[in-house]
UniProtKB/Swiss-Prot annotation:
One Pfam family hit: PdxJ
Family affiliation: Belongs to the PNP synthase family.
UniProt-recorded name of the protein: Pyridoxine 5'-phosphate synthase
Species: Shigella boydii serotype 4 (strain Sb227)
GO biological process, one term: pyridoxine biosynthetic process
Keywords: Cytoplasm, Pyridoxine biosynthesis, Transferase
């Protein structure tokens, strides 16, 4: 069974800051609190439109984090150049549409193998570990292995958004099978998107899961209980699922 880690996404600290154009709340301070509360890493998504996290945030976080930085980004020349210069510990390559509220699905790795292979090589050559954000689909998982990504992050949005218990159970089986298949190919398996305090334990219980990246639910809880308690409670639930 893989060690289970929690990556805390702090994008929405920046969303709140940018809503008023102020210098607060500070994502760097939030990252420090999350680390104190048990976060194993900090995730930020530098979007092309800079709607929350900024280039400055990325630079300062890379210099100040005690744990690991996971930079989510689109596969563009601009973002690849920023990553190579900044050198986060991890880069998670994601699809991105300017009009979307949040990432809506996984990368089509199988449909753009050469582009993904080139991106993975460029990042790997810079000493960055690469993850591909994909749906729980065997074709995409095989493609991820073929293009040289050591990690995948399974998109859990369909599981999180399921309307019925039966639909959610079906999605859980699909994710678990995908995790097993990916591990059989030598890939390390992360997961994220839409995970909450109510649905995280079933995903955390999947033996192959290495890291869960969770943001919106934790930041939402933090508004009510404080960030330190919100992070600690999510980590407790995840580890409880492992017995």
């Amino acid at each position: 069974m893989a060690e289970l880690l929690l990556g805390v996404n702090i994008d929405h600290i920046a969303t709140l800051r940018n809503a008023r154009g102020t210098a607060y709340p500070d994502p760097v301070q939030a990252a420090f609190i999350a680390e104190q509360a048990g976060a194993d890493g900090i995730t930020v998504h530098l979007r092309e439109d800079r709607r929350h996290i900024t280039d400055r945030d990325v630079r300062i976080l890379r210099q100040t984090l005690d744990t690991r930085m996971n930079l989510e980004m689109a596969v563009t020349e601009e973002m690849l150049a920023i990553a190579v210069e900044t050198k986060p510990h991890f880069c998670c390559l994601v699809p991105e549409k300017r009009q979307e509220v949040t990432t809506e699905g996984g990368l089509d790795v199988a449909g753009q193998r050469e582009k993904m292979r080139d991106a993975c090589k460029r990042l790997t050559d810079a000493g960055i570990q690469v993850s591909l954000f994909i749906d729980a689909d065997e074709e995409q998982i095989k493609a991820a292995a073929e293009v040289g990504a050591p990690f995948i992050e399974i998109h859990t949005g369909c599981y999180a958004d399921a309307k019925t218990d039966a639909e959610q159970a079906q999605e859980l089986v699909r994710i678990a099978k995908a995790a097993t298949f990916a591990a059989s190919l030598g890939l390390k398996v992360n997961a994220g998107h839409g995970l909450t305090y109510h649905n995280v334990k079933a995903i955390a219980a999947i033996p192959e899961m290495h890291e869960l990246n969770i943001g919106h639910a934790i930041i939402g809880r933090a508004v009510m209980t404080g960030l330190k308690d919100a992070v600690a409670e999510m980590k407790r639930l995840m580890l409880e699922a492992r017995g």
